[in-house]
């Protein structure tokens, strides 16, 4: 007689084992119809699963976060059902849930086309409309092997081989189609109506480029059509903001096949890049960092000592010269330890903060490259703080405050902070981990802001803090990090003289605020849709004459503004003023200055904004003050 305790504390007693669906039906017909699955004693189970003991139960519906994940996972299985009907020789591989959607990897004799994608989606919709039940069968391993052998599903058999020899596995039947999964899944396809397939891409078996290539079908699914429509609208807006498209429109950068994953910065884009670098240089100088520069190409001996050669070699670009092996640095930290190691260091020298705009290169898979967001050559606002264990909390607290201030200057105020703690496989004593995690947690608490733990997500040698920004489309971008590291100083023999004259290893704090400049600029382009705040805009003001008679004064204004440290250009082309205004508005120039005969006579400029606001005529000095105020606000006016 199982006694079921519901979330509100009420209890229901049953005479025999009862399924989640039956419990829901005993509560009400509406809940029974909405039931996707259940959470029994905290564990997700299918709606058909029986409960044979006293237990707590939460009914999972599409309104729950877990419910949405179940819907998406079931949609992935539905791809399999549709694909096997349309392309019977296709081999199904895996179909997991991802952020806001799902995908299925498939082996097929030819690449799928957009027409195939449309056909698969149409067949999925037809299958959903039949409202068939999804049937779960717990099946002995030997029988599972027989099922997939008879169907020629080679990849499923390879997956079964990797799984522990359990008594039974979950097989989910979508009519004639069967897939293997831990579950849970929807009980009926009526829950899958709000879905859409989104794109095709390539993939590799087990994610290894040495293995056979597969095709990946992506999709998204939501609790209802309204949520799906909102998502599609958001994606369409994101496509309009695609940094690759805007980068071309604004002449910021380009990429080409001869240098995959390497950015060709044009004058406009390089201006934005330089503003970022100069800003971060000023910020770091004001906060006690020493800027250094370290070599690009370093002997493998250093990478062996640091551990990168054995753990990261496949991602490193290497070369040889005069019988010596070298690597182009994928990260800056080992080189920064070399700078620290020059000369004797005392505890009085700590904390020592070494910063570098370090150019790094990583041999990312070509299929993973994406515009300037995911590249092979990039620059980091990288720094390493060498300090004593007692100084960690203050250094971390100062870094948190600095990082949040920097993000505000770029218009980002929605920042999530997470503390990743000790993983199962780790080095160092429990006491060391306790102190390290405690120092970072205390620093986070000192900020007065909310943060959360990520248990087990730390590096094997130490905990870390991650900063995730949310942009105007609600997308999350992991940017800043603070990594506690006692390991690299040990490997590279870094030490300082303590107060008692003993040699002690420093703690090394790896930290970055923007991360990769390339990726951060890509984020800014999409966040602002290319409408950069005045301080970042490649051209801050354009001066336009109406006729040739005003050309000399236009050039005087340009010279005066540039002489005051602004970025101004004149447009003296023999075009109608309306044409010029439209063109520079499309180029997202913040301020458009028009000069006619009246402006020449009064020595003023007629000021318009790219948003179309007419600010009237004013002396050049007054406009310079207006522009100066806009620049000094940086991106904060965009977020306040």
Curated annotation (Swiss-Prot):
Keywords: Aminoacyl-tRNA synthetase, ATP-binding, Cytoplasm, Ligase, Metal-binding, Nucleotide-binding, Protein biosynthesis, RNA-binding, tRNA-binding, Zinc. Residues 242-533 are annotated as: Catalytic. Binds 1 zinc ion per subunit. Residues 1-61 form the TGS domain. Its cofactor is Zn(2+). NCBIfam families: thrS. Homodimer. This is Threonine--tRNA ligase. It comes from Pseudomonas entomophila (strain L48).
